[in-house]
């Protein structure tokens, strides 16, 4: 008699409703990033947006993706975009939205100077709250220089 196997049913319909806030543990890095980004002063970034065109993605969302991406080794904007579909922490940070790689890259390029300062602020807060482990990253001019050289045109 042949062995019976349970096969995958790829036509199964899942009717599941999940609140993004319920899928990550309370102490997850993605929650920390969202919390810290919400405390930063982003007025200089908001000031650069006009009234014309469609509604842009919130700077907090795009900055959160960049910060979390850098913290977890995801630097490519194409990988960041893909992660908003495939990775629960990125989906959480993006609030279920999916900015394309060009939008993320344009945001990064247009706000490079502000982002350098904001990244340092995030790192300092992470260090002060104990989220940043000793030896993970140095917080000095090298971080800013690395960020500048990696993303200057």
Where are the model-predicted features located?
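Detector for conserved single-position "signature" residues within domains
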Residues: 1-153
